[in-house]
From Swiss-Prot:
Pfam families: Phe_tRNA-synt_N (PF02912), tRNA-synt_2d (PF01409). GO terms for biological process: phenylalanyl-tRNA aminoacylation. Tetramer of two alpha and two beta subunits. It comes from Thermus thermophilus (strain ATCC 27634 / DSM 579 / HB8). GO terms for cellular component: cytoplasm. The keyword Magnesium applies. The lineage of its organism: Bacteria, Thermotogati, Deinococcota, Deinococci, Thermales. This is Phenylalanine--tRNA ligase alpha subunit. Its main location: cytoplasm.
Amino acid sequence: MLEEALAAIQNARDLEELKALKARYLGKKGLLTQEMKGLSALPLEERRKRGQELNAIKAALEAALEAREKALEEAALKEALERERVDVSLPGASLFSGGLHPITLMERELVEIFRALGYQAVEGPEVESEFFNFDALNIPEHHPARDMWDTFWLTGEGFRLEGPLGEEVEGRLLLRTHTSPMQVRYMVAHTPPFRIVVPGRVFRFEQTDATHEAVFHQLEGLVVGEGIAMAHLKGAIYELAQALFGPDSKVRFQPVYFPFVEPGAQFAVWWPEGGKWLELGGAGMVHPKVFQAVDAYRERLGLPPAYRGVTGFAFGLGVERLAMLRYGIPDIRYFFGGRLKFLEQFKGVL
């Protein structure tokens, strides 16, 4: 029995087969168990001798079962490890990856250009008050300049708009029509000198076509300090042109009216590659009435006036126009169309 059992144990192919062999020989109804139950019928001397033989067989079977179980477990583990082994030299699985939107790419490029010139990038709320969007920028109620912007007016029910220092702002609410309100907000909360740019989304209630959208992006610039002059503004726009279009680019200013600057100008940049002038935006020296409105607001908050005797310049330009030029996009509506084939072209562009 021993030799037969040891051979069967050694040839067991898996743990289930080994478990069956253990039950066959050592279980409650196993062969060895039955042999031991029959010891009581034997004479004393023969019982003692036979008992020793059966105990030796039991010990040998238990040792063989334990050794075979350990060997089978190690083999199973080795097989599992081999099956789950990862070849790190193989190429990785191809995963879908997104990319930055062309507007984001253009906006980041503009911000980095001005950061290199010492400007700080700040952001403001898209839901704005009539005061910051119009009144403080020298565009009072019934001023004809308000006709330049068709505005999305809001009811404001249940909405609390905060001012530059966390105070509640009263009055009619709207979706900002330009990024210029952040000029006033920043000046209320800070004192000169400073240089900032304000990238952001703006809203106009107008008909859309290939060059006009109801939602688009602007980049606002504001520099305030003692002795700031029009020459500094020209220098800033010149540096922008050089960074965007190379050393052969030039800048042209033409007088134009904006209520919040005086004098005001429309600036264009010479595009050497295209061989033409590109109108990029408007600019000018900050109107004294804007500084007065800022100081008046500061005084209402208990702050001392900070904008007497200083000057500053401001400028604004459209991000979509530059992105259309940079990436050869013929229609502004492509930016918000949500077409994956269009957006996937910009994957990997930094």
